[in-house]
């Protein structure tokens, strides 16, 4: 017993929670002898387009007997008066039934499937008897809120008699209006009696803003007593029959409203029926339901009262009955014209689920994926910003063939991905003013319109991608390189540079894709991707983006503007460098370069070297004094001094010649290496190991330069760089090597040292002589 009850509950709840994707009119009414057309909707799939469609009548036992199907079956009772037509291009099928009788009243199902237990929708059909009217009764049929004009004829004898219109209420006939200017209070400001032109046998009564209670039998009368002329008029006031709208979840719907010229100057609205009331979701006076914020637009079509309401990003709760109308208050009022719709939201949507909210931070970027119908890959794509004015508007910011709107240059681009069923919109350099709602649109299938809310918060840290400085200047004809730093989390992603223009951001080739003017290289060990312009041209000026992506999925980006200027006359030509790379690598390179310059200055200004030079000069002066005294004393002393001087100058001249040759060779080698240098190679050639091991390798023969302090500073810098490297990279071995500049310094230091030694010998020689 418990098991059976559990199975029953499961069946009941599963039936409640599962909504059939078939949709049609719930209630259909007509009168005997007339015809009806019943339209049923089904999901747009290949299987549904080709499967069996049927129309069956439910019996008391729950069995549904087929009356007509798309397989060609037609029951006897429908023979000659019914048809079923499938419209696969619209995903609908229509059942037409003619010559209705009261016996056709009942419950029916329209559905899909090989049996009548497949997918279906319940329809109730009611056929009424033809109403009986008195002889010569004219029938007027009007919708609620409209105006009816009742025509009343009379004979010439009653041309000057009293005219009136009354409404039958049981056996009595209550006057609505007469020619004495009497008007029933319930018809005040709505009923008018008049005659047209020179007509002497017809008068007219207009009743405007019709309401359901106005329906009934009316009597026109001209004259009094037995000679009076009377006409009967039956007025039927109908509720507007709702138009069916079948839409997929996450798609869009448009309500086209045409209320007529009589309300062209009144405020318009769209409301959703809720039991006895109709709640306004938008009107032309600025009222808007918060549940539709960012996804609704009201657009006037012309001056005749036509307007449309577009809703995107449909949700399950959007299904229901809607009405559009007009009134000076912008709210529904009885007796004013309305149009009605019934919206069905199919949860088995072909539109993929996408993010409805995207978050970003100031200075950062967002990449928004917009789906579109894959069958329309050649359609034009757009992206617009929803603005909350009175009716709502969405001006286009960018499109596949549209220029980027002013104010978004350099920071907005649309990347079309044909065949993928989606395109990507990237917006960078975010500000809090960018927060709001955005729409993805195409000029194809109007159902594929999606809404995204962008939320931009204040940044609390630096962006993941960073290029500094934000304003860079390149010189025409020179080589320009700029670096983009990225964190370790982007290590496995593809890094790229692209040049922004009004028609997108075109990705630049990397070095291994061939030599071109603009190229990109990536240094994984230092997490830098660099862009090089070689040589710089005037057309290279503009915005450049550095970004990351995985396949066709775009990630973060950052932007920089590169200005291009002519080389000033007399300015030096610096080939391998650029201001941006120098600024970015300043903490590392400036410390290295300043240390090298400090080492060179200390070597040149060493006081010991100046002391040695002074000793050579003093030794020469002392030798002259000794030679002068020798000349005064004896000729033998003069001859001995000349021999000593000759033996000293010859080796000194040879040493000077050897030193000059060594310096020249070192300078030539240094010049060749400089020609191959760039900023990055300079950082590689002069490694930390060179400064640590230079003393052991003879690079610091001048001990007065006190290199210990310099080595301490450089070692500390090297340790900082090691800790900031990505842990995924193996540590590079540091090999000590001697640069060409150090070799030149070594040769020059050796020359000075040997010169000081010879000078000391010259100083000692004459004394011993």
UniProtKB/Swiss-Prot annotation:
Keywords: Cell membrane, Disulfide bond, Glycoprotein, Immunoglobulin domain, Membrane, Phosphoprotein, Repeat, Secreted, Signal, Transmembrane, Transmembrane helix
Domain Ig-like V-type: residue ranges: 21-126, 135-237, 240-341, 353-457, 463-563
Top-rank taxon: Eukaryota
Pfam families: V-set
InterPro entries: CD300_family_receptors, Ig-like_dom, Ig-like_dom_sf, Ig-like_fold, Ig_sub, Ig_V-set
Gene Ontology cellular-component terms listed: extracellular space; plasma membrane; receptor complex; recycling endosome membrane; secretory IgA immunoglobulin complex
Region span, Disordered: 569-604, 619-640, 719-741
Glycan-modified residues: 90, 135, 206, 471
PROSITE patterns given in the database record: IG_LIKE
Bilayer-spanning residue ranges: 644-666
Leader sequence residues: 1-18
UniProt modified residues of type Phosphoserine: 678, 687, 694, 740
Post-translational modification: N-glycosylated. N-glycosylation is required for anchoring IgA molecules to mucus, but is not necessary for Ig binding.
Protein's GO biological process: detection of chemical stimulus involved in sensory perception of bitter taste; epidermal growth factor receptor signaling pathway; Fc receptor signaling pathway; immunoglobulin transcytosis in epithelial cells mediated by polymeric immunoglobulin receptor; receptor clustering; signal transduction
Any one Gene Ontology molecular-function term assigned to this protein's record: polymeric immunoglobulin receptor activity
Topological domain spans for side Extracellular: 19-643
Disulfide bridge partners, by residue number: 40-110, 152-220, 257-324, 370-440, 484-546
Cytoplasmic side: 667-769
Basic and acidic residues bias (residue ranges): 595-604, 731-741
PANTHER family: POLYMERIC IMMUNOGLOBULIN RECEPTOR (PTHR11860:SF82), POLYMERIC-IMMUNOGLOBULIN RECEPTOR (PTHR11860)
Domain notes: The Ig-like V-type 1/D1 domain contains three complementarity determining region-like loops CDR1-3, which mediate interaction with IgA and IgM.
Assembly and oligomerization: Interacts (mainly via CDR1-like domain) with dimeric IgA. Interacts (mainly via CDR2-like domain) with pentameric IgM.
Listed name of the protein: Polymeric immunoglobulin receptor
């Amino acid at each position: 017993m418990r098991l059976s009850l559990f199975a029953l509950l499961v069946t009941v709840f599963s039936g409640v929670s599962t909504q059939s994707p078939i949709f049609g009119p719930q209630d259909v009414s007509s009168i005997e002898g007339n015809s009806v057309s019943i339209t049923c909707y089904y999901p747009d799939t290949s299987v549904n387009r080709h499967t069996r469609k049927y129309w069956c009548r439910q019996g008391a036992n729950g069995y549904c007997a087929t009356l007509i199907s798309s397989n060609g079956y037609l029951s006897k009772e429908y023979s000659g008066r019914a048809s079923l037509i499938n419209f696969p291009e619209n995903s609908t099928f229509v059942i037409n039934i003619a010559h209705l009788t009261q016996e056709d009243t009942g419950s029916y199902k329209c559905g899909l499937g090989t049996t009548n237990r497949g997918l279906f929708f319940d329809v109730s059909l009611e056929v009424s008897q033809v109403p009986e009217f008195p002889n010569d009764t004219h029938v007027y049929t009007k919708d609620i809120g409209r105006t009816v004009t009742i025509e009343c004829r009379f004979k010439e004898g009653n041309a000057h008699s009293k005219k009136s219109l009354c409404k039958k209420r049981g056996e009595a006939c209550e006057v609505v209006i007469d020619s004495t200017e009497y008007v029933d209070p319930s018809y005040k400001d709505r009923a008018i009696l008049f005659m047209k032109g020179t007509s002497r046998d017809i008068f007219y009564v207009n009743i405007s803003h019709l309401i359901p209670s106005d329906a009934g039998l009316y009597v026109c009368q001209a004259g009094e007593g037995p000679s009076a002329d009377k006409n009967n008029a039956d007025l039927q006031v109908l509720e507007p029959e709702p138009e069916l709208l079948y839409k997929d979840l996450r798609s869009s719907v448009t309500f086209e409203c045409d209320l007529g010229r009589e309300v062209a100057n009144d405020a318009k609205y769209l409301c959703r029926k809720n039991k006895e009331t109709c709640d306004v979701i938008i009107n032309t006076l600025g009222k808007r339901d918060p549940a539709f914020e960012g996804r609704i637009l009201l657009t006037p079509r012309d001056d005749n009262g036509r307007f449309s309401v577009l809703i995107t990003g449909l949700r399950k709760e959007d299904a229901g009955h809607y009405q559009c109308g007009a009134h000076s208050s912008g709210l529904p009022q009885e007796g004013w014209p309305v149009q009605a719709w019934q919206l069905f939201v199919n949860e088995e949507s072909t539109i993929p689920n996408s993010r409805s909210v995207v978050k970003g931070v100031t200075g950062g970027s967002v990449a928004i994926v917009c789906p579109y119908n894959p069958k329309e890959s050649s359609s034009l794509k757009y992206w617009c910003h929803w603005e909350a004015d009175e009716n709502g508007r969405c001006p286009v910011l960018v499109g596949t063939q549209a220029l980027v709107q002013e104010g978004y240059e350099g920071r907005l681009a649309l990347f079309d991905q044909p065949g993928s069923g989606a395109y990507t919109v990237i917006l960078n350099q975010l500000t809090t003013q960018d927060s709001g709602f955005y729409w993805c649109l195409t000029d194809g299938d109007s159902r594929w319109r999606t809404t995204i809310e962008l939320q931009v918060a204040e940044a609390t840290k630096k962006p993941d991608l960073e290029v500094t400085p934000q304003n860079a200047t390149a010189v025409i004809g020179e080589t320009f390189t700029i670096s983009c730093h990225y964190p370790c989390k982007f290590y496995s992603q593809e890094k790229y540079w692209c040049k922004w223009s009004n028609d997108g951001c075109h990705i630049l080739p990397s070095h291994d894709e061939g030599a071109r003017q603009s190229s990109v290289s990536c240094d994984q060990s230092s997490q830098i991707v660099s862009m090089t312009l070689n040589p710089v041209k005037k057309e290279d000026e503009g915005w450049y983006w550095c970004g990351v992506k995985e396949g066709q999925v775009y990630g973060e980006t950052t932007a920089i503007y590169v200005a291009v200027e002519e080389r000033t006359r007399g300015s030096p030509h610096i080939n391998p460098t650029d201001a941006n790379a120098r600024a970015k690598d300043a903490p590392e390179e400036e410390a290295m370069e300043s240390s090298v310059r400090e080492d060179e200055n200390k070597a040149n200004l060493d006081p010991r070297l100046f002391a040695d030079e002074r000793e050579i000069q003093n030794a020469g002066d002392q030798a002259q004094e000794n030679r002068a005294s020798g000349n005064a004393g004896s000729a033998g002393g003069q001859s001995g001094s000349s021999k000593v001087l000759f033996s000293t100058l010859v080796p000194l001249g040879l040493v000077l010649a050897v030193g000059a040759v060594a310096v020249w060779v070192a300078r030539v080698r240094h010049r060749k290496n400089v020609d191959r240098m760039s900023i990055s190679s300079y950082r590689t050639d002069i490694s930390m190991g060179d400064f640590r091991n230079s003393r052991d390798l003879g690079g610091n023969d001048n001990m007065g330069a006190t290199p210990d302090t310099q080595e301490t500073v450089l070692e500390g810098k090297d340790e900082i760089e090691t800790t900031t490297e990505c842990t995924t990279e193996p540590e590079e071995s540091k090999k000590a090597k001697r640069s060409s500049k150090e070799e030149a310094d070594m040769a020059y230091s050796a020359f000075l040292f040997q010169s000081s030694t010879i000078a000391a010998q010259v100083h000692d020689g004459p004394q011993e002589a």
